[in-house]
């Protein structure tokens, strides 16, 4: 399988970019990964890169976007930070990947059994990590369905907080970046959230987070703190 070129990138729609990732994840789960000559891809991309998607994911060693979506060199721009939080540096990276490098899709990808989410659930204090976990705390607060054992030992609670964090990050992208919001509104890029299972290898896209053009299925409706303030 060849890496994307300037010509092939120009034909990719946001919807097709999402389909590429769905198909790649199914290959990964079924252990039917596409054959790639990686050295040939190194040669093909030495003059430039033409990615079709950008993935914001956690630093967890099990969640490499290129692997779980079965993509090659030059296909995906990968942004990684614990808890898939959004800040100005993350947004700047996304703006470069979409406006400059031509990416057609932005995915915010959380994952099950996330250490950062668990740390936030347990109110862990540890050096600079505490500052990062504090940015996830609103997602813990916004989870209202679990009344007992609101700690990392409750898998259902952790899963709910994980999904809320993904949704907050998706919303923060369009709330805090004029560049990306306008590209979404013009249908130039798509934006969607998803959760990766470290047990099965499957990515579940949160369909109601999909934004592209006039299609926007959800608005974050969480009391008290808006997405922009909560993810700063």
Language-model region placement:
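Conserved H-X4-D acyltransferase segment
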Residues: 50-59, 63-65
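Short active-site oxyanion
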Residues: 52-54, 103-106
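Short beta-strand segments
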Residues: 56-58, 80, 107-111, 192-197
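Catalytic core of membrane glycerolipid acyltransferases/transacylases, capturing the structured
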Residues: 62-79, 85
